[in-house]
């Protein structure tokens, strides 16, 4: 369960990076230079700093692709977990459970799996509290 939480936190972190605001491109920097007619040394330093932002765009592209790969693998894992949970919980065959899960959207599958693990962890915590208070 700890690994699942850590993986979920990593997925959220990559999502934040991928969704962040894109940096200014070199084309936009050229427009700024033309508009402001930069002659001052400080402005030239500022433009050099902004030119380095193109590296950030490449990094953001890498994290965006990595995020898509991680999300795809997480979706596959959740699909398998949802099938296993349905087989165990509802007592149906694996094929029937697979058909039910295939009919669900990715969002519904995620919610189903997270809801199951949330109930499971809260019931374990509740049992620990009840047992510790009874003695």
Curated annotation (Swiss-Prot):
Coiled coil: none
Keywords on record: Antibiotic, Antimicrobial, Cytolysis, Hemolysis, Secreted, Signal, Toxin
GO CC aspect terms: extracellular region
Pfam families for the chain: Latarcin
Localization of this protein: Secreted
InterPro entries (alphabetical): Latarcin_precursor
Signal peptide segment: 1-20
Keyword Secreted annotated: yes
Tissues of expression: Expressed by the venom gland.
MF GO annotations: toxin activity
GO terms classed as biological process: defense response to bacterium; killing of cells of another organism
Propeptide: 21-60
Sequence similarity: Belongs to the cationic peptide 06 (cytoinsectotoxin) family.
Protein purpose: Insecticidal, cytolytic and antimicrobial peptide. Forms voltage-dependent, ion-permeable channels in membranes. At high concentration causes cell membrane lysis.
Protein name according to UniProt: M-zodatoxin-Lt8q
Source organism (scientific name): Lachesana tarabaevi (Spider)
